[in-house]
Amino acid sequence: MESIGSHCCSSPFTFITRNSSSSLPRLVNITHRVNLSHQSHRLRNSNSRLTCTATSSSTIEEQRKKKDGSGTKVRLNVRLDHQVNFGDHVAMFGSAKEIGSWKKKSPLNWSENGWVCELELDGGQVLEYKFVIVKNDGSLSWESGDNRVLKVPNSGNFSVVCHWDATRETLDLPQEVGNDDDVGDGGHERDNHDVGDDRVVGSENGAQLQKSTLGGQWQGKDASFMRSNDHGNREVGRNWDTSGLEGTALKMVEGDRNSKNWWRKLEMVREVIVGSVEREERLKALIYSAIYLKWINTGQIPCFEDGGHHRPNRHAEISRLIFRELEHICSKKDATPEEVLVARKIHPCLPSFKAEFTAAVPLTRIRDIAHRNDIPHDLKQEIKHTIQNKLHRNAGPEDLIATEAMLQRITETPGKYSGDFVEQFKIFHNELKDFFNAGSLTEQLDSMKISMDDRGLSALNLFFECKKRLDTSGESSNVLELIKTMHSLASLRETIIKELNSGLRNDAPDTAIAMRQKWRLCEIGLEDYFFVLLSRFLNALETMGGADQLAKDVGSRNVASWNDPLDALVLGVHQVGLSGWKQEECLAIGNELLAWRERDLLEKEGEEDGKTIWAMRLKATLDRARRLTAEYSDLLLQIFPPNVEILGKALGIPENSVKTYTEAEIRAGIIFQISKLCTVLLKAVRNSLGSEGWDVVVPGSTSGTLVQVESIVPGSLPATSGGPIILLVNKADGDEEVSAANGNIAGVMLLQELPHLSHLGVRARQEKIVFVTCDDDDKVADIRRLVGKFVRLEASPSHVNLILSTEGRSRTSKSSATKKTDKNSLSKKKTDKKSLSIDDEESKPGSSSSNSLLYSSKDIPSGGIIALADADVPTSGSKSAACGLLASLAEASSKVHSEHGVPASFKVPTGVVIPFGSMELALKQNNSEEKFASLLEKLETARPEGGELDDICDQIHEVMKTLQVPKETINSISKAFLKDARLIVRSSANVEDLAGMSAAGLYESIPNVSPSDPLVFSDSVCQVWASLYTRRAVLSRRAAGVSQREASMAVLVQEMLSPDLSFVLHTVSPADPDSNLVEAEIAPGLGETLASGTRGTPWRLASGKLDGIVQTLAFANFSEELLVSGTGPADGKYVRLTVDYSKKRLTVDSVFRQQLGQRLGSVGFFLERNFGCAQDVEGCLVGEDVYIVQSRPQPL
């Protein structure tokens, strides 16, 4: 039986102490186009050959027995020149133990040029192997043909390039591996990060040439040298497809078709960016420009001569105009994170516009070189026609590629050419790199020295010193030097960005703008180099034992080994903020990590285990950091894939380049390395907590077909055969209606954290749907392997298990706790308000004939409102009636204490009710009664598919917008509250807060309004009325068997509180109903954060009803808290503030946590006893006072 249990996998890493002589692996480059994957041993060089054939396994075994027994190791770099769909990856199986001996797959690492890995094998053996594609769901797709067979020489370093399905291919001659101490980690993310040092290319005599970053990314045609002017227009085979294009995309594709050379293409980009005025159009222009320029700089969109004659100064002038516009866009107050992110990707694709390149005749050195008399005539002609004439007529990126190819050629053999000639050509090469902004980070930083003040120079010199020590240390695993270099880089980048943030004046001289471009490129280059440093650090961390060793250190209460990883993460998150992405969030995460780093792991925190509290607190922040990286990646996935596909198809870009574009952007960014570090640290934290990555929201057991969906949206779920299904859901916002989406849903597995007591959690519990979340990447991958299969989900507080089920698909029962409608909750039975309970007869919506509305104006009291103390179910709804009862209970609570002396006292905000019938009266006064009745009739049968239901809901909402709350009603409300009071307008429908239909969060609440602004107040009430007819509300009532005509809405108006904390209490633990615990979930600020299912976790406390013992179950990590501004307008809106939990008492003060937990437990137990059943309670903490704003029956 295939199973995903609750166990954790052990790490394959071996721990080595910091003082060990072992060093981090060093990365090397095989050729100028291939970057290699993770290395784990020191390199050796050789010139031996490799051959590849196909043979049978029996022959392989015979040959393996004959291998050389000398023990000499061979370094083999393998690249599979093949790309796969986003989310899939490539692995290999093989006969050698280093790749799993056919039992385990060995993953390859992604690069733009294919999938790569490095193996260290015993020399002399015969290696048999084969590639597989590992799908996103975990399934394997093997390449066809016989097993590949490779005869491994006795010693040396080699590389091979393979192609998918070509198992009998003749491999290219092996290339010797040259050393490059300047490259970071395993190479698979290194393609776009040749910024740390100059890219080194070996020549026959061992000389090293400094190559440009442009050359390292080139995917266009190789340089072709000519001895006459044969350039012409060689643009053959390209196709442009403008069908279906419009707007910016159409303009860009037509512009490319009419622009053969580089300067015309740059001018077209300038026109597109400058000509985009509207925000949406502007973002599109930036996105398409970034994609287009990237393809030009990598040679996938070629540039040719078109018969014109424009020196490079023309390109420089256009570049300056583009640069100014980008800086202007990003400096605007309303600049979006998306615009800033995309603009940063355009900068490295622009040429320099320094004074020497805007001169009338720039780059003249090549003319002098081409006319020297100390070089052969043929070489002179090749330089003249291939480089000089082309550069001065129609410069393009291909000129730098040709120059580097020529430089490598003339330096291959020492003494073959004049030393002065070679030296001058090298100088020209550096000038050309400078023009294309393709120099190394060191060269870029050197070029800006002249403009730096003493503080800047000090930061720059410190960075150079740290970098030099790191590069010459000879040990890539020198963690201390890595951390020092990271700190110095951060300091330097901060200095640069501070200067850049001063802005660009409209009257800034050209020289200042040119230097500003250098500063901008340097800070982008520093971010790229941090990617390299963080990658090296991750390798070092793995070498030292990785997550397993970190977890062991926590177990032994020695957490000093966590200091460097947390430092690295803080610095990495700081770099993301410096790049303009969620700066306040990055700052808060950094503050928290530093605070937790400084806190000792205590034996006890209050009455709780210090190790557990330390780990849970850190886990909350690590989850927050990983959420930051996920949101960044999600943004890239929203921005690029559809636009890359549109532009790529129209421009005839190879499908492989289109398919891998976004993955390359994600993997080449610092956010990718931060995500990897978070994954390692979270694994260590989970191991130390004994956690398995599961969180049980609703326990139980169920079976069904596992179906993967993006979200729970009615009408959008895939069709099934009619049997029970278990949903594997990528995202949720907490307001979803599960049964309304599909009546066959038996279970939900959500791949993000979610408050247990969110509206979604409450609804799932009421509907008896087993609900779990999972945040462990390894388990998620295993789960996806079972998509489409009939499985059994078992969830309890102690474990979660997902297994292939032996039960047949014919089984139609939804779960072991079959969903049933509580008939009694909708039955009729008279009771008075003081004995209000879940079985009230008034809790059932009243019935009405098809020709009349449920309530009439004669039901409305004088003045249009009812005092909260007088509210009852028939006139005001269950919520208002419960709040009225709460007000009377609040007085009694002041005299009640728990057995341990903890007070059960609480307060209730003052309030009034706009009763049932008020909406109908407003409809009548607006002459909209008949139109509304007609739409309501259509609503009963409207189909959710095809937009029919949405259209009718929209029409009803338009009717509601035209309504007005009577002036006498607003005047009455004004008299009931203080003059400057802020109010909240809440729903109190006859179809919510019932035992069989809690409708938690289904209807609107509008905060921060005041009757002193009648227009805003009236509009807020109408929004609450309209929320009765949203798509979700209609489908929810259908699922419960309630007619749309039977639904009506009263409005509860209460004093708006400004809480420090908001909470939801369940007086019976949802995860463990027999535990005699009150469970609380707490969020900073207003309670909407909890109720709506905002991404993140709340503080979670459990308090014993009898013993008063408080357990901390989780720490909060919501990114924002919602507040009501006391000085701003009463406009129905919140203020959002970023939360720093290192400053929140509930996180850092164990005594306060204990006291609050006991207080909430006492209040919850008091309410449960007085209401006579388990309660779902909402409230908040204002100063030292507990306020209760709502209590309703808790679904069990």
Swiss-Prot record:
Modified residues annotated as N-acetylthreonine in this record: T55
Targeting presequence: 1-54
Gene Ontology biological-process entries: protein autophosphorylation; starch catabolic process; starch metabolic process
Cofactor needs: Mg(2+)
Induction section of the entry: Circadian regulation. Induced during light phase and repressed during dark phase.
Keyword line: Acetylation, ATP-binding, Carbohydrate metabolism, Chloroplast, Kinase, Magnesium, Metal-binding, Nucleotide-binding, Plastid, Transferase, Transit peptide
Main location (coarse class): plastid
InterPro entries to which the protein is assigned, alphabetical: ATP_grasp_subdomain_1, Carb-bd-like_fold, CBM20, CBM20_water_dikinase, GWD1_pHisD, Ig-like_fold, PPDK_AMP/ATP-bd
The protein's Enzyme Commission number: 2.7.9.5
CBM20 domain mapped to chain residues: 66-166
Pfam families: CBM_20, GWD1_pHisD, PPDK_N
CDD domains: CBM20_water_dikinase
Positions annotated as active site in the UniProt record: H759 (tele-phosphohistidine intermediate)
TM ranges: none
Other observations noted: The reaction takes place in three steps, mediated by a phosphocarrier histidine residue located on the surface of the central domain. The two first partial reactions are catalyzed at an active site located on the C-terminal domain, and the third partial reaction is catalyzed at an active site located on the N-terminal domain. For catalytic turnover, the central domain swivels from the concave surface of the C-terminal domain to that of the N-terminal domain.
Assigned protein family: Belongs to the PEP-utilizing enzyme family.
Subunit structure, as described in the record: Homodimer.
Record note on domains: The N-terminal domain contains the alpha-glucan binding site, the central domain the pyrophosphate/phosphate carrier histidine, and the C-terminal domain the ATP binding site.
Protein name, UniProt field: Phosphoglucan, water dikinase, chloroplastic
Organism: Arabidopsis thaliana (Mouse-ear cress)
